């Protein structure tokens, strides 16, 4: 066992040869490297698989022995200052390593086919492998400086991947927005690290926690300064995990390829913030105000993310806001001190969200045969619907992911979300009501995405109804036929204007600037699943894309049993609690207590009921449009024109405006922060040009005129110089004489 831990340092570096060899190959042998480009997918998967096996071995030893292993090397030693590099293997490290490697492998296999058409194929796999290296280095770090280095590398990789299609201005702006927003949090993180080093004199986690606890116990620190440093540390996690108010970069990050979205939202970038708070939880728990702040930010993010997802038209952005809300649940759990439930939800959400993103990628891939390469169309749920018969495997898989995120048993997210909601009742009834209500909103918007994508009829082929009052079928459309608005208020949710429908049926293919090439045979091939390519309709994805989706379905079905919250006499079924035995859990400090079946069933029924209510509302509002038209008179008999209907329309329009305008937070930032910074820049520029340059230029002009004046006085005659000299001396002597008097 000791030997296994000694070689754990190799974990972050195993995926690193792929980007290095690709870079060297493109530099020295560009033609050969590009011709053999499909080979790199296999090498990336192989190296990450080795890391996964290594991580599983470490995890088994962690579960059996509950040990913590740390190894450090001295890098810089100078008098009282020393900087060490090393690695730390504990339950948190082993959990994150398995999460990163398993999700990373399925995403890489999926990407081989998804990116086969792209000229940036080699660049994509180089970035992905380096992303895995950076994240693995982050989770194995043994001190704050090492974490900060890999933290910045993760941010750099996300910048490169979000802006992968940098020839598209929208993607270029998105990666810049993500980079700048994260710089705010990263600057706070750096200041917090330096602050705690100034307080404790150590960067190492174990020394830092011990010294800081003693200082707090003996009341030897400035509590205000300590709180400020802790807030700055937390700011880094807020930005990286897209928590309010630094969440604005997350929906724009969807401009990258879909496999990148799956990796970022499941196991890498957004998980880094949760990991950082979990790693520093022994530091935060001795500062009660910080724990309260963490839980407050978490509950705000839970509700905000859910409300922003309610009316999204872009399938990936809807899932992005879902990620934001679920990360809020994890942050809420950490703020409450429920360490176990936070990590449990991190695990279950990662596999479910990876499944949903890869499923959405399969849908987008199939829609591109109809609408061409145009993300505004291929990702727009307005054009979808009725995909069940065209992509049945993707549909079934997406349904499993949707039900899991809704919290329906026995799927993965049910177990973890239910545990967080139950813990919230112990912490704060107000927070519990918000968390419980948001679970219903989650079920509503997730099932809405599912219904608009797969149920009903294919909306692109809905042109037979374009001359009727009911032909338009957008999601929350603000503009629509007046005949519809007068007769049927619920169809205001399903309207769009006539000009948008005209371009639905264009046969023009929109290719990305210089980034698209002909599709070639994937390097990785999987057994046939029975998919057929019928290009007049969406078609099921290739086997290489379906296989990772089906693997994630298995994870979504069974990974929740890893943390079953009840044990029986003589049988310890709660593997996760056993795994986390050395860790801190404030709400459940005795994890060996047996939980009563009746109590568990009551809590589960309470949380599942709100999920089913959300699903019911979504099914009522977003059932197939054709069925709505057939039952139009029946529905109109219940919904009459009057004050109540006008009030309902105002609520719907308010929800639409709030969601589509991102809660007006981006507009607020653009007006006050961006506008304010630009105004300050213009003022600084004016001051520099008019004042600073004016002084410099004025001195130069004055010197010029003085020189010219002196030049005109001096004529080159020595007698004139002597006369002036004697005159000045005489004047000086007279002044000196009169002053002495």
UniProtKB/Swiss-Prot annotation:
Q: What transmembrane ranges does the database entry give?
A: 9-29, 40-60, 89-109, 125-145, 147-167, 185-205, 219-239, 258-278, 289-311, 318-338, 344-364, 396-416, 425-445, 546-566, 605-625, 721-741
Q: How does it sit in the membrane?
A: Multi-pass membrane protein
EC top class named in words: translocase
Q: Single Gene Ontology BP term? A: ATP synthesis coupled electron transport
InterPro entries reported for this sequence: NADH_UbQ_OxRdtase_chlpt_su5_C, NADHpl_OxRdtase_5_subgr, ND/Mrp_TM, NU5C-like, Proton_antipo_N
Please describe what this protein does: NDH shuttles electrons from NAD(P)H:plastoquinone, via FMN and iron-sulfur (Fe-S) centers, to quinones in the photosynthetic chain and possibly in a chloroplast respiratory chain. The immediate electron acceptor for the enzyme in this species is believed to be plastoquinone. Couples the redox reaction to proton translocation, and thus conserves the redox energy in a proton gradient.
User: What organism does this protein naturally occur in?
Assistant: Panax ginseng
The protein's UniProt keywords, in alphabetical order, are: Chloroplast, Membrane, NAD, NADP, Plastid, Plastoquinone, Quinone, Thylakoid, Translocase, Transmembrane, Transmembrane helix, Transport
Could you name the Gene Ontology cellular component terms for this entry?
chloroplast thylakoid membrane
EC number in record = 7.1.1.-
Q: How does it assemble?
A: NDH is composed of at least 16 different subunits, 5 of which are encoded in the nucleus.
Q: Where in the cell is it found?
A: Plastid, Chloroplast thylakoid membrane
Write out the catalysed reaction: a plastoquinone + NADH + (n+1) H(+)(in) = a plastoquinol + NAD(+) + n H(+)(out); a plastoquinone + NADPH + (n+1) H(+)(in) = a plastoquinol + NADP(+) + n H(+)(out)
Q: What is this protein called?
A: NAD(P)H-quinone oxidoreductase subunit 5, chloroplastic
From which residue to which does any coiled coil extend? none
Q: Which GO terms describe its molecular function?
A: NADH dehydrogenase (ubiquinone) activity; quinone binding
Name the gene.
Answer: ndhF
The family note in this entry says: Belongs to the complex I subunit 5 family.
Principal location listed in the UniProt entry: plastid
Question: Gene3D superfamilies given for it?
Answer: 1.20.5.2700
């Amino acid at each position: 066992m000791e030997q296994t831990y000694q070689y754990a340092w190799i974990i972050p570096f195993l995926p690193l040869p792929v980007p290095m060899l690709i870079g060297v190959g493109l530099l020295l042998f560009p033609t050969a490297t590009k011709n053999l480009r499909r080979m790199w997918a296999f090498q990336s998967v192989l190296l990450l698989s080795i890391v996964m096996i290594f991580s599983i071995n470490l995890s088994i030893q962690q579960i059996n022995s509950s040990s913590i292993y740390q190894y450090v090397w001295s890098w810089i030693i100078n008098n009282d200052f020393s900087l060490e590099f090393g690695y730390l293997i504990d339950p948190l490290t082993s959990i994150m390593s398995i999460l990163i490697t398993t999700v990373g492998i399925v995403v890489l296999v999926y990407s081989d086919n998804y990116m086969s058409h792209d000229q940036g194929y080699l660049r994509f796999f180089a970035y992905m492998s380096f992303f895995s290296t950076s994240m693995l280095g982050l989770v194995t770090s043994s001190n704050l400086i090492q974490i900060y280095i890999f933290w910045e590398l993760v941010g750099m990789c996300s910048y490169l991947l979000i802006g992968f299609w940098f020839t598209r201005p929208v993607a270029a702006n998105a990666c810049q927005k993500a980079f700048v927003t994260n710089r705010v949090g990263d600057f706070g993180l750096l200041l917090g690290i330096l602050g705690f080093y100034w307080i404790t004199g150590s960067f190492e986690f174990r020394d830092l926690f011990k010294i800081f606890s003693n200082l707090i116990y003996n009341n030897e620190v400035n509590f205000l300064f300590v709180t400020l440093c802790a807030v700055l540390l937390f700011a880094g996690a807020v930005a990286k995990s897209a928590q309010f108010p630094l969440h604005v970069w997350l929906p724009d990050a969807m401009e990258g390829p879909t496999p990148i979205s799956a990796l970022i939202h499941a196991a890498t970038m957004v998980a880094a913030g949760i990991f950082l708070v979990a790693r520093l939880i022994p530091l935060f728990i001795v500062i009660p105000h910080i724990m309260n702040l963490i839980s407050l930010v978490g509950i705000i993010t839970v509700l905000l993310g859910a409300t922003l997802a309610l009316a999204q038209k872009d399938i990936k952005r809807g899932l992005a806001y879902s990620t934001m809300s679920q990360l809020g649940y994890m942050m809420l759990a950490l703020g409450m001190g429920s360490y176990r439930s936070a990590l449990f939800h991190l695990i279950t959400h990662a596999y479910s969200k990876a499944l949903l993103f890869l499923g959405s990628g399969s849908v987008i891939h199939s829609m591109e045969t109809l609408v061409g390469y145009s993300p505004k169309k291929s990702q727009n749920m307005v054009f979808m619907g009725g995909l069940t018969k065209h992509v049945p495997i993707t549909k079934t898989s997406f349904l499993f992911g949707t039900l899991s995120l809704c919290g329906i048993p026995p799927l993965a997210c049910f177990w973890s979300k239910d545990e967080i909601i139950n813990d919230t009742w112990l912490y704060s009834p107000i927070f519990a009501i918000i968390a419980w209500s948001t679970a219903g909103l989650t079920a509503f918007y997730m099932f809405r995405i599912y219904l608009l994508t797969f149920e009903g009829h294919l909306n692109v082929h809905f042109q037979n109804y374009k001359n009727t009052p009911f032909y338009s079928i957008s999601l929350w459309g603000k503009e629509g036929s007046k005949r519809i608005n007068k007769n049927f208020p619920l169809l205001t949710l399903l309207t769009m204007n006539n000009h948008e429908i005209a371009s639905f049926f264009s046969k023009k293919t929109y290719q990305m600037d210089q980034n698209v090439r002909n599709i070639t045979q994937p390097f990785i091939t999987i057994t046939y699943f029975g998919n057929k390519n019928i290009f007049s309709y969406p078609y099921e994805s290739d086997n290489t894309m379906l296989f990772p989706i089906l693997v994630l379905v298995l994870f979504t079905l069974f990974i929740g049993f890893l943390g079953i919250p009840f044990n029986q006499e003589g049988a310890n079924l709660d593997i996760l609690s056993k795994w986390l035995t050395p860790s801190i859990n404030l709400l459940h400090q005795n994890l060996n207590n047996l939980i009563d079946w009746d109590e568990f069933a009551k809590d589960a029924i309470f949380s599942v009921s709100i999920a089913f209510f959300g699903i019911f509302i979504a099914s009522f509002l977003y059932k197939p449009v054709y069925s709505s038209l057939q039952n139009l008179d029946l529905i109109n008999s219940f919904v009459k024109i009057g004050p109540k209907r006008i009030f309902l329309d105002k609520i719907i329009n308010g929800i639409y405006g709030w969601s589509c305008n991102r809660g007006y937070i981006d507009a607020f930032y653009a007006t006050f922060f961006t506008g304010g910074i630009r105004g300050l820049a213009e003022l600084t520029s004016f001051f520099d040009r008019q004042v600073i340059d004016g002084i410099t230029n004025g001195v130069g002009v004055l010197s010029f005129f003085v020189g010219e004046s002196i030049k005109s006085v001096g004529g080159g005659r020595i007698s004139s110089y002597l006369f002036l000299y004697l005159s000045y001396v005489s004047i000086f002597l007279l002044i000196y004489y009169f002053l002495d008097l």
